[in-house]
Amino acid sequence: MAPNPPDRPPHSNWRDLPNWPTRRTVLEYTGATATLATLGLLGGSAAAQDDDEVGADDTDEDDGETATDDGPAYSYWLPDDPRELEFVAVDWVTLNEYASDELEDAQPDDDVPAEFEADPMIAPVSEGALSAYLFVGLDLAQFGLGRLLDDGEMFDSTVSELLQTPDTYVVLGDIDPAEIDERLTAEPAAEFIRQLEQTDEIDGYEVYTPVEDAAGTAIAVGDDALVVVDDEAVDALAVLESMIGAARGTADRAVDDSESFAWALETAGGGDVVIGQLGAPAGSAAAADDGDRLVDFAYPELEGAETIVSSLTIEDEETSTGNFAAVIDDPDETALADVLGASGTDQSVDVDGSRVTATATWDEEDVAVARKM
């Protein structure tokens, strides 16, 4: 079981206590800059040491989705947004098998090597993975779904992938709509639990909204996905329609409207944890104005990048690889080579006009040495 948050009394269900801290507080507490390489390659879970190689199959057996030449399956859920787009995508099957213990046991005093924090291919992806993981325990707890990732202990529904954007959270997998309905519509068992009721339907998904009117909150439930919107600043139903429409092919997708984004996804979007942005350039005034961004690529070397996709893939119990793709106005190849994948080995950085690609590898031995320095 994960440790209690600081300054909180011991409680067996501390994730579900009413005065739960903000996502930012918890990210800081769990060490948001702890890298996936550190989480996975140091003290890897026993599950990761099975004979079966983790992450070797791109086919998702749980929900039947398969990455195609047109892009990874999660990309179908990313609608064309006239503003900007940020996302975090997690192959939960792989991450759960490999690093679930490390995700839960991360401590605030974990020493993270400075070179990891300074590497755009490591820190942002790691923060994204933790954000997606913690969203379920934090944000979904208010709907009675806070333990959805707990390996069948509380739910018959199973999770294969997680997708987070600033407006929405998508749980992909084998979902039992009746089970979710029972949780959402149940009489609240605690003060902080919000009761919902079925009020609408969108393209085969049953839509639930709070019994007590709350702007910006709606949950769509289907047998292959659970789509959550909980942001009072948006029209929740419109957001659901846009995202479900993209997934069903009845609304425009970001990948279809942007050649640079499609290229970046094809190049670097196939990892076990993937983050990306399309829109406000990294380091721009528009990006700086948003102090709570989902994806943080605020590195001087990436200033002016309008499209970025970065991913980490778990190859086995000892090795992770990273892939990076960006479209940057007037990129500085020397400066980029100093940071992209610099904390790993087998580093490669290539600049072709405005297109930048990079790859690197992180091995258990290298990570262990870095943490001792």
Residues covered by each model-derived region:
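Soluble, non-membrane globular domain cores that form compact, hydrophobic packing
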Residues: 2-167, 172-373
